[in-house]
Amino acid sequence: MSKGISEEIIASFKQQLEQHPIYSAISTVDDLRCFMEHHVYSVWDFMSLIKYLQSKVAPDEYPWLPDGDTSIKRFINELVLEEESDQALPDKNNSDGFSSHFELYCEAMKEIGGNPHDVHAFLDQIKKAGINKALANTSIPEASRIFTRSTFKFIESGKPHIVAAALALGREHIIPCMFRSFLQEIGITEQDAPAFHYYLNRHVHLDEDFHAPLSLRLLNELCGEDNIKQNEAIDAAKAAVTARLDFWDAVLEEIECNRKRVKTG
């Protein structure tokens, strides 16, 4: 009988990501701004992974029939709820609202002088012409373009277990921690960047407490005891890690080029 995909397997992949030099390379607000203007596309395409999985695990079909692991259904539904319509930062009147994590991230970008215009132009083009034309014809950064294409290749496989493998590797707990440490180091307080700090607090809480163990359960639920699916999922996890490492390499190179432009400009 197959034992499934273990936490150790996923952890071994994540270790490569967490040791990437990009996390220690960000030392100025300009570096952070450059990072975020690339990373925002990864924040956006994560929603497509979970929306695809929701359509497979908890489809909106009727007549409805009870079927499958209800804890997995709840996980994917809650993940969509949190990512698409989480509690927003209270406004000046302390009124509560709701916001996607992508929109929160864009607000955080603006607080440190980043410009989300290009990613919004990219989304506008998706509405008009679809994802493939948008990736080919917009001013999306090259590193982000390549990474986003890799995400949609997982989805286009039409295999939920492959998409779940990409999901399991789609979050890196080190990023919110890196952001928080950097903001503290250069003195950007919660008063200076309330949306940024709020975004980080939400992610650390949700990722560490809920998402990681349940994403592995979802992956094993979709693979079952099928060795072929398990091997495909492991291969997809490796591919997801490679895509992310290549992404970080390219973003780090762009950060270094940006530093040179600032010095010579």
Write out the residue ranges for each language-model feature.
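Non-heme di-metal
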Residues: 2-265
